[in-house]
Design a protein with these regions (language model features):
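Metal-cofactor-dependent catalytic cores
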Residues: 1-158
């Protein structure tokens, strides 16, 4: 259950074999290596499973901006694991920590770096990877594992 006017998890997205778009699920366990049932080809092949790239988050508003510019995007299209509502992109600064869900059960993630656009985004148009540069989302590590569900509150801890 979410509280009004508070940030929350709008959608949880996974892709068991990689690729875009990721598909929505209602609930998920978040581990140090990412979301159960999700496979990130780039992280596993190019980054050797780097845990600082365990989770990808993006605000819904960023996806909506691209949609208003004519790109056919919906939550999950950018490859993000968590689409957040009520959060601005500039709030996802490096080092920022967030609790997703209940204080005693929800995962705690830490923003680590910008996710650079990859060639998989070409499915949305030739110029899209360039247009998405700096706005693809933010990679995060998992400080505390836990379970989170769609609609869960997002609390900034730092």
């Amino acid at each position: 259950m979410r509280l009004s006017n508070r940030p929350f998890v709008l959608q949880i997205n996974v892709s068991p074999r990689g690729g875009l778009p990721k598909k929505a699920v209602e609930t998920v366990k978040v581990t140090k290596m990412g979301l159960e049932g999700d496979y990130n080809t780039f992280r596993m092949t190019k980054l050797s499973g780097d845990p600082t790239s365990a989770v990808l988050v993006i605000p819904r508003e960023t996806i909506s901006e691209f949609a208003r510019a004519g790109y056919k995007l919906v939550p999950g299209s950018m490859g993000e694991n968590f689409t957040l509502e009520g959060v601005q992109y500039d709030e996802l600064s490096i080092g920022r920590r967030m609790l997703l869900g209940k204080k005693d059960q929800g995962p705690i993630i830490k923003i680590e770096r910008v996710c650079d656009p990859c060639d998989e985004l070409l499915v949305y148009g030739k110029s899209f990877p360039k247009d998405a540069y700096g706005k693809r989302g933010m990679y995060a590590s998992v400080e505390r594992e836990g379970r989170v569900e769609k609609g869960a509150p997002v609390e900034f801890l730092s």
